[in-house]
Amino acid sequence: SDQLAAAIEGREIDLALVDASTALFLERYDRVLVEGAGGLMVPIRDDLFAIDYIESRRLPLVLVTNGRLGSINHTILSLEAVKARGIELKAVVYNRYFDKDSVIAADTHGFIERYISRHFPDCELIDIPVLN
């Protein structure tokens, strides 16, 4: 987690610096990605999760998922949290690298695609193929 990485370094995450850096990039570029890792409920600090940061800054979200066991549950829980917080969902990226079983992969992808089309009709589903 971000919190653990900061603790290991003996530092605290400076959100004002992150905000200032983001603003600087937004002045220079049309699109800026602020990347998190580990999910929406990863702690940045004891009192702040990634989803809190996204919500408070009104950042549009691109959610990344895959076909691993449990990913339907993880993805739907994340999407429900996004909806409850009123966060704008731009896209869901489906990473096919973890598609080890074609039947399970097709079912997982299909379920997520149907869910998004019903609950987030303006959201794009983007497939990332395996690159050899």
Question: Predicted segments — roles?
Answer:
Residues 10, 120-122:
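Short, flexible coil/linker elements and helix-boundary hinge sites characteristic
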Residues 36-120:
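Conserved catalytic-core segment of NTP-binding enzymes
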Residues 2-44:
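Phosphate-binding/switch loop-helix module in NTP-utilizing enzymes
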Residues 125-127:
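Conserved beta-strand scaffold positions in the cores of enzyme catalytic domains, especially
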